[in-house]
Swiss-Prot record:
Record localization: Cytoplasm; Nucleus
B box-type zinc finger span: 222-263
GO molecular function: identical protein binding; ubiquitin protein ligase activity; zinc ion binding
Comp. bias (Acidic residues): 51-75, 148-166
Main location: cytoplasm
Coiled coil: 281-374
PTM note: Auto-ubiquitinated.
Biological processes per GO annotation: cellular response to lipopolysaccharide; cellular response to muramyl dipeptide; defense response to virus; positive regulation of type I interferon-mediated signaling pathway; protein monoubiquitination
GO cellular component: cytosol; fibrillar center; nucleoplasm
EC number assigned by the record: 2.3.2.27
Transmembrane helix as UniProt keyword: no
Protein name in the entry: E3 ubiquitin-protein ligase TRIM41
KO phenotype (gene knockout): Deletion mutant impairs the production of inflammatory cytokines and type I interferons in macrophages after infection with both DNA and RNA viruses.
Length: 630
């Protein structure tokens, strides 16, 4: 598997073969030199310090003309006796130095520089060594010949001072030093500059450009820290391309205009960034694990609750007839569906948290491992690691809690089924209620039998009473309960502004309504009705806090359940017109049901504290009426 993983990518290899070793970009007008390597025409021409092959014929002609001129000059010098004078070493050295300076000036003025020239130092060193050897050779010969000429001159002067030396014995002019042209890749040298166009390679490069507009970057970084292109140490980091480069790459066209920093600096910077992500990831993981444990406990509690309720349902239905067995099966089915839906939500939340925990664990381990690495291993895919660390977001599960009072709990099941069978609902627990006129707000009008209430046309003159509501259009039932189970039904008419429920005895009836609403203790009924139409859905908070009222009602088209500690928007499947209110004093439960379909609406868990609890009614708008069912 490791061998397969290290196999180079053919596409990447093809891209690399189409890149010039001098400019590190795709070939432009590629040419081949004598050793077979290919380069851009402009790059190799600048490297060799001359013009391209097209001007070679003209240069050859100029060289031939110069040779002819030199021969004529030699003949002229020989004829004039110039060679009779011994050559001085300093004269010859001066000529050689001038010639070397001219060649160097021409060479550097030809535009050599830019990318990858540092990698060509060996070319200049070899040429300088060859020139020095040739110069020493010629200077040595000149010195020897000069000595011989001096001896010969002395002998001739002794014989005949007027006799001239034979020009044939004079030193011939030194040949011009030859220049070598070296391949920048294989270092092979050539006596003449020669290259030819490579049309097939040019066509291939055009195809590669269409596939990949820019040369690949990934192959330059390896585990050994050596640039595979230039065999130089990777000591720099390009912040634009986000890759390690060598000093030769820094001078190339690809990176020359980019921001480059030392590799060690960026390694330390990225290490610090990774360390900065470790602690937040650890905290996220701990938070997810805590929520996961909490969800698992809730699932266990829900399962236990389901088992206990199913056992209670089975016990109640065991005493009923065949008809009750059918009802039992139907209710058990609905109950299981309800619990399975809750279990599904809880299980899904636990699974999501488990997935988040696993993901965070993997990412945390990766970040810790990467933060301990150094050099190039740390930088590989570092941006992707940062993105995944930064994109991690804690997704808490949906906040929900199982309703402790299910719509078909055992304390209501028997009475509901008996009522359905006999069209009566547990007469032992059913209450025949009436309204208490001493508690009614002056804007409320009670029916003669005290079973109905609505808004009056105008405010009524009623005697003062300590129990009377003076700040809100409410009325209580005449009967209160301190123990036992009790059930009553209420019929509501109109669609706006009503509430039914229960209130504890120790309520304050005279307080002004706080920020949640306004008082209606004065003014006529019309202004009261207009004011109540602008009220919020819920009961005023000051009223609820001091009265301990638990009620379900509407304002406009929306249903909601309201108490001093709870405010819940409701979405019943059907809009109930007849409510059943079920009070279990000892259990501290107050349940609301659709009396026509026995559908559960809402259940409060309340603390009655040994006080009497009275039925509670509220009317807010004209056209709304409440009637107690016998």
């Amino acid at each position: 598997m490791a061998a397969v993983a290290m196999t180079p990518n053919p596409v990447q290899t093809l891209q690399e073969e189409a890149v010039c070793a001098i400019c590190l970009d795709y070939f432009t007008d590629p040419v081949s030199i004598g050793c077979g390597h290919n380069f851009c025409r402009v790059c190799v021409t600048q490297l060799w310090g001359g013009e391209d092959e097209e001007d070679r014929d003209e240069l050859d002609r100029e060289e031939e003309e110069e040779e002819v001129g030199e021969e004529e000059e030699v003949e002229a010098v020989g004829a004039g006796g110039g060679w009779d004078t011994p050559m001085r070493e300093e004269d010859y050295e001066g000529d050689m130095e001038e010639e070397a300076e001219e060649e160097e000036e021409v060479f550097w003025s030809s535009g050599i520089g830019g990318s990858n020239w540092d990698n060509m130092d060996y070319v200049w060193e070899e040429e300088e060594e060859e020139e020095e050897e040739e110069l020493d050779y010629y200077l040595g010969d000149v010195a020897d010949l000069r000595g011989e000429d001096e001896d010969e001159e002395e002998e001739v002067l002794e014989e005949d001072e007027e006799e001239e030396l034979d020009p044939i014995t004079q030193l011939p002019p030194p040949p011009a030093p030859r220049r070598c042209f070296t391949c920048p890749q294989c270092r092979k040298s050539f006596p003449r500059r020669s290259f030819r166009p490579n049309l097939q390679l040019a066509n291939m490069v055009q195809v590669i450009r269409q596939m990949h507009p820019t040369p690949g970057r990934g192959s330059r970084v390896n585990e050994q820290g050596i640039c595979p292109r230039h065999q130089e140490a990777l000591k720099l980091f390009c912040e634009v391309d986000e890759e390690a480069i060598c000093v030769v790459c820094r001078e190339s066209r690809s990176h020359k205009q980019h921001s480059v920093v030392p590799l060690e600096e960026v390694v330390q910077e990225y290490k610090a960034k990774l360390q900065g992500h470790v602690e937040p990831l650890r905290k996220h993981l701990e938070a997810v694990q805590k929520m996961k444990a909490k969800e698992e406990r809730r699932v266990t509690e829900l399962k236990s609750q389901m088992k206990s309720e199913l056992a209670a349902v089975a016990s109640e239905f065991g005493r009923l007839t065949r008809f009750l067995a059918e009802e039992q099966a139907g209710l058990e089915r609905r109950l299981r569906e309800m619990h399975e839906a809750q279990l599904g939500r809880a299980g899904a939340a636990a699974n999501r948290l488990e997935e988040q925990a696993a993901q965070l664990s993997r990412l945390l381990a990766e970040a810790q491992e990467r933060s301990q690495q150094g050099g190039l291993r740390l930088l590989q895919d570092i941006k992707e690691t940062f993105n995944r660390c930064e994109e991690i977001q804690l997704q808490p599960p949906e906040i929900w809690s199982p309703d402790p009072c299910q719509p078909h709990s055992h304390d209501f099941l028997t009475d509901a089924i008996v009522r359905k069978m006999s069209r009566m609902f547990c007469q032992a627990a059913r209450v025949d209620l009436t309204l208490d006129p001493d508690t009614a707000h002056p804007a409320l009008l009670l029916s003669p039998d005290r079973r109905g209430v609505r808004l009056a046309e105008r405010r009524q003159e009623v005697p003062e009473h300590s129990k009377r509501f003076s700040a809100d259009c409410c009325v209580l039932g005449a009967q209160g309960f301190r123990s036992g189970r009790h059930y009553w039904e209420v019929e509501v008419g109109g669609r706006r502004g009503w509430a039914v429920g229960a209130a504890r005895e120790s309520t304050h009836h005279k307080e002004k309504v706080g920020s949640g609403g306004s008082s209606v203790s004065s003014g006529d009924a019309s202004s009261s009705r207009h004011h109540h139409r602008r009220r919020r859905l819920h009961l005023p908070q000051q009223l609820l806090l001091q009265r301990e009222v638990w009620c379900v009602g509407t304002h406009g088209k929306r249903y909601q359940a309201q108490s001093s500690t709870e405010q819940t928007l409701l979405s019943p499947c059907e809009k109930p017109r007849r409510f059943g209110v079920y009070l279990d004093y000892e259990a501290g439960r107050l349940g609301f049901y659709n009396a026509d379909t026995l559908a559960h609406v809402h259940t409060f868990s309340a603390a009655f504290l040994g006080e009497r609890v009275f039925p509670f009614f509220r009317v807010l708008s004209k056209g709304t009426r409440i009637k107690l069912c016998p």
